[in-house]
């Protein structure tokens, strides 16, 4: 039994609004329509439209041959697939697809391994997650309100909780500390 009441993620909508739709166009016969792998998946899997080699310690741009039109008030975020990273050291470059973009959506893949990695046409390479946009009016100030944290960053909130047997993020980022 699911303690939160549901084992799936429903589409983001409210009863007083029409059901949102994600429209897409295939630019070639190689384009694979986006798919949610499970009913509870947050994103739509994106597939490579071509065979592409990602060089060792390099990167490659992988076209999906898909063009999208997002529901009003949403944009698309390109997110990694955990399996590619865990098994093959392949990561996805962050990507934002603006709602007014009408070009071929491509995915930047980074290969952190010592061997080249072959992507085949039809391979899942990333996921597309739709997120709502907030675009507030800008207001410049001469100074902002104070907080307890202030300008402390890069691991500062975890400094008191770091186990002495573990290295903190700052130790890994600071040259000569290892």
Curated annotation (Swiss-Prot):
Key words of the record: Hydrolase, Magnesium, Metal-binding, Nucleotide metabolism
Reactions accelerated catalytically: dUTP + H2O = dUMP + diphosphate + H(+)
GO BP annotations listed: dUMP biosynthetic process; dUTP catabolic process
Cofactor: Mg(2+)
Listed pathway(s): Pyrimidine metabolism; dUMP biosynthesis; dUMP from dCTP (dUTP route): step 2/2
Function: This enzyme is involved in nucleotide metabolism: it produces dUMP, the immediate precursor of thymidine nucleotides and it decreases the intracellular concentration of dUTP so that uracil cannot be incorporated into DNA.
Source domain of life: Viruses
Disulfide bonds: none
GO molecular function: dUTP diphosphatase activity; magnesium ion binding
Pfam families (UniProt xref): dUTPase (PF00692)
Protein family according to the UniProt entry: Belongs to the dUTPase family.
EC category: hydrolase
Enzyme Commission number, as recorded: 3.6.1.23
Organism: Fowl adenovirus A serotype 1 (strain CELO / Phelps) (FAdV-1)
Protein's recorded name: Deoxyuridine 5'-triphosphate nucleotidohydrolase
